[in-house]
Amino acid sequence: MARTSESSPYVEFDRKQWRTLRKSTPLVLTEEELYGLRGLGEQIDLEEVAEVYLPLSRLIHLQVAARQRLFAATATFLGEKHPDQQVPFVIGVAGSVAVGKSTTARVLQALLARWEHHPRVDLVTTDGFLYPTAELNRRGIMHRKGFPESYDRRKLLRFVTEVKSGAEEVAAPVYSHISYDIIPGQYHLIRQPDILIIEGLNVLQTGPRLMVSDLFDFSIYVDARIEDIENWYIQRFLALRKTSFSDPDAHFHHYAGLSDRDATSAAQEIWHNINRPNLVENILPTRPRATLVLRKDANHSINRLRLRKL
């Protein structure tokens, strides 16, 4: 049985307990499709999809239906003409750099789009809402890129508000990991999705004013030991020398020719000066706000889950 207590707002599961909640949900993802969704260094396989992500997709499917009934009831109370109009269900996915939240978001998008009644599932990363490099330099915070103040939070809030309000088309800026900057004039157009997934480091942040997390209907925090995340970050950094960093136009091209020793040293410096402080100061404190916490072991596999019941 799942572990819970009357004084805790959470129900805790190990993977064996969680997988029973899949019920009869079919596995509709192929190995070829999963390969295209898997991030660099990620070890997710179809077994994990079946045992972790299928029960999660079932839970969200049930919550989408319940939320639409709630919106319809409110619309009926207000005397609106179209009480059955769908309101986009918004999911936030948070976690550290290198923890695998992008893979989680992509797999979830693929599974949710196969459920009846909500085939239109869009995914947007908050990278597109970073201030452009020129603006970060103007503000003197280029060294704080990825920290909350490096994002145009008003723009992100306005974007999600417009999507959730039913706007026919809303544009999200596009970020390039090659140029390490916003791509001028390029946008990801969102057209009235059934579900919108917002993935990013700081999406569960709170504040004295309305924040984007206040608009989420469901939220996920991808968690792991800090020491494991550091190791994953370093291994990913080493692998990027032969992929993204090898592009002559890449912002980090100067790392491509480093030896393993020098690349490891560079990755450790970036981790301890930027990514670890951001995780400890800003990202990790938002974990209690998540509807569901996915806890990874050192081998990247999800083996524990914590679901908020209140």
UniProtKB/Swiss-Prot annotation:
The gene is coaA. Keywords: ATP-binding, Coenzyme A biosynthesis, Cytoplasm, Kinase, Nucleotide-binding, Transferase. This is Pantothenate kinase. HAMAP family: Pantothen_kinase_1 (MF_00215). InterPro entries: P-loop_NTPase (IPR027417), PanK (IPR004566), PRK/URK (IPR006083). Its EC number is 2.7.1.33. NCBIfam families: panK_bact. One of its GO terms (molecular function) is pantothenate kinase activity. The keyword Ion transport does not apply. It is an enzyme of class 2 (transferase). ATP binds at residues 95-102. It catalyses: (R)-pantothenate + ATP = (R)-4'-phosphopantothenate + ADP + H(+). Pfam families: PRK (PF00485). It is found in: Cytoplasm. Pathway: Cofactor biosynthesis; coenzyme A biosynthesis; CoA from (R)-pantothenate: step 1/5. Its main location: cytoplasm. It comes from Rhodococcus opacus (strain B4). One of its GO terms (biological process) is coenzyme A biosynthetic process. Belongs to the prokaryotic pantothenate kinase family. One of its GO terms (cellular component) is cytoplasm. The keyword Transferase applies. It comes from the Bacteria.
